[in-house]
């Protein structure tokens, strides 16, 4: 049932709001729908932060432009520097709540702008306010939806935010200094998941604040839709990319789109904060798929479905691959020392003495040595003693965030210039995937640390001396 607008809020006229979904007033969750005590709640999916890093991480030699010896790596490769705590984590599982908290549009009011604060005084009433001018605003009230669960994502640490996300700066570092300002909105986006199979997840730009409101100011991009409803975009936008062919061995990057406050799909604006919206893409939806990327202008999230995670390698498989690689006893072709990938449990303080190092231009793997610097080519340039190619020389680290991997293939390739190691198909997919950067630029980056990829291919096949090759 669509309710008539309340004239007491100062509305000269009220329009009925048409919306999709079941009609009717608030209905509580049906008995028996929720997980019983001791049962695992139904998982809708997981969000994984790409290249999650925090302040205090040290730069790699390649990023710092120095070659002075082994040093701590900057990325945290599947975990925040201070550890995953509370709502601030490197990944978050979205599971069915004990009670539905979703909302859906209900009534639209046209009111005088000065009366907006009075109209929105009810904290229990979710609403979106569109300021059209100094004298005219449109308020869309939302009502409880017993069929969906809502999860909110943003920079704010207030209780209504389920997943607190901070900026991941280009190159695998974190924004530092007093002048560094976050470009992620405090209430960036919201995801609504159906509580019944197939548990579809849909993404919407903007989240509700502590007063259960979303405000689109006079300068925000907003418009009236052909059916008389309202829609708009947030200041820096919420971009989504669905991979072609799903998130699997045959995946290819899709096309980046922008999601509106009401969940419609548009082509990208000329720049991130431009007031002119893109064109409506009618044959695409805001439904998240396995491998969908969500960019919040400062951090990029990967959505994995439960079915997709079953196909991904497990941490046990990654550990077995590490042990298998070490069991082959690869050697440094110059120093003839045995190389070994360190255990993730050892931590990331500094490269181990047996740590493999790679010349990222050619892929030849060596042990660490302090010679071969080519200062005339720059402080980070070294000459490979086998093929004489000059380029960055970095330690190799096995990628430990299994959810970022397309397949359980052997660790045969490394990203350039950071040195994170994964399977060939995983490396090639991410090297071909442009991630948003700044107001209108795109650049491929390592999914484990966020470092911008360099070179012709962005990754290199590793050439070991010994049985591994």
From Swiss-Prot:
Pathway: Protein modification; protein ubiquitination. This is E3 ubiquitin-protein ligase pellino homolog 3. GO terms for cellular component: cytosol. One of its GO terms (biological process) is innate immune response. PANTHER family: E3 UBIQUITIN-PROTEIN LIGASE PELLINO HOMOLOG 3, E3 UBIQUITIN-PROTEIN LIGASE PELLINO-RELATED. InterPro entries: Pellino_fam, Pellino_FHA, Pellino_RING. The keyword Ribonucleoprotein does not apply. Residues 1-39 are annotated as: Disordered. Keywords: Immunity, Innate immunity, Phosphoprotein, Transferase, Ubl conjugation pathway. It comes from the Eukaryota. It catalyses: S-ubiquitinyl-[E2 ubiquitin-conjugating enzyme]-L-cysteine + [acceptor protein]-L-lysine = [E2 ubiquitin-conjugating enzyme]-L-cysteine + N(6)-ubiquitinyl-[acceptor protein]-L-lysine. Signal peptide: none annotated. The modification Phosphoserine is found at residue 11. Interacts with TRAF6, MAP3K14 and MAP3K7. E3 ubiquitin ligase catalyzing the covalent attachment of ubiquitin moieties onto substrate proteins. Involved in the TLR and IL-1 signaling pathways via interaction with the complex containing IRAK kinases and TRAF6. Mediates 'Lys-63'-linked polyubiquitination of IRAK1. Can activate AP1/JUN and ELK1. Acts as a regulator of innate immunity by mediating 'Lys-63'-linked polyubiquitination of RIPK2 downstream of NOD1 and NOD2, thereby transforming RIPK2 into a scaffolding protein for downstream effectors, ultimately leading to activation of the NF-kappa-B and MAP kinases signaling. GO terms for molecular function: ubiquitin protein ligase activity. Belongs to the pellino family. The keyword Phosphoprotein applies. Highly expressed in brain, heart and testis, and at lower level in kidney, liver, lung, placenta, small intestine, spleen and stomach. Isoform 1 is not expressed in lung. Its EC number is 2.3.2.27. Phosphorylated by IRAK1 enhancing its E3 ligase activity.
């Amino acid at each position: 049932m669509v309710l008539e607008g309340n004239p007491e809020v100062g509305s000269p006229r009220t329009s009925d709001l048409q919306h999709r979904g079941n009609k009717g007033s608030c209905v509580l969750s049906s008995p028996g729908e929720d997980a019983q005590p001791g049962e695992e709640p139904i998982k809708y999916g997981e969000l994984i932060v790409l290249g999650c890093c925090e302040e205090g991480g040290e730069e790699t030699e390649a990023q710092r432009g120095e070659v002075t010896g082994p040093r701590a790596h900057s990325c945290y490769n599947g975990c925040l520097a201070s550890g995953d705590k509370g709502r601030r984590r490197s990944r978050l599982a979205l599971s069915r709540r004990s009670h539905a908290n979703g909302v859906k549009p209900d009534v639209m009011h046209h009111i005088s702008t000065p009366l907006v604060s009075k109209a929105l005084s009810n904290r229990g009433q979710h609403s979106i306010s569109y300021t059209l001018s100094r004298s005219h605003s449109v308020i869309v009230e939302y009502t409880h939806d017993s069929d969906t669960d809502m999860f909110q994502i943003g920079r704010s640490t207030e209780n209504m935010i389920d997943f607190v996300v901070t900026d991941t700066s280009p190159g695998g570092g974190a924004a530092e200094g007093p002048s560094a300002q976050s470009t992620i909105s405090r209430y960036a986006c919201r995801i609504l998941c159906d509580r019944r199979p197939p548990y579809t997840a849909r993404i919407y730009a903007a989240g509700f604040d502590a007063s259960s409101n979303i405000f689109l100011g006079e300068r925000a991009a907003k418009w009236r839709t052909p059916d008389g409803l309202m829609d708009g975009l947030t200041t820096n936008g919420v971009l989504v990319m669905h991979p072609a062919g799903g998130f699997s061995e045959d995946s290819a990057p899709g096309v980046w789109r922008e999601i509106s406050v009401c969940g419609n799909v548009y082509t990208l604006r000329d720049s991130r904060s431009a007031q002119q919206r893109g064109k409506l893409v009618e044959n695409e939806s805001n439904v998240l798929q396995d491998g969908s990327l969500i960019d919040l202008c400062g951090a990029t999230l990967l959505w994995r479905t439960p079915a997709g995670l079953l196909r991904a390698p497990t941490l046990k498989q990654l550990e077995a691959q590490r042990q298998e690689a070490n069991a082959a006893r690869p050697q440094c072709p110059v120093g003839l020392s045995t190389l070994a990938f360190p255990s993730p449990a050892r931590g990331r303080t500094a490269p181990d003495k047996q740590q493999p190092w790679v010349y990222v231009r050619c892929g030849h793997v060596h042990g660490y040595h302090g010679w071969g610097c080519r200062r005339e080519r720059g402080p980070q340039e070294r000459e490979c003693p086998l093929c004489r190619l000059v380029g960055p020389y970095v330690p190799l680290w096995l990628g430990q965030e299994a959810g970022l991997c397309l397949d359980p293939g052997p660790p045969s390739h490394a990203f350039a210039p950071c040195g994170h190691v994964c399977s060939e198909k995983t490396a090639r997919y991410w090297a071909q995937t442009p991630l948003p950067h700044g107001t209108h630029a795109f650049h491929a980056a390592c999914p484990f640390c966020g470092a911008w990829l360099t070179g012709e291919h962005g990754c290199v096949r590793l050439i070991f001396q010994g049985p591994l090759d």
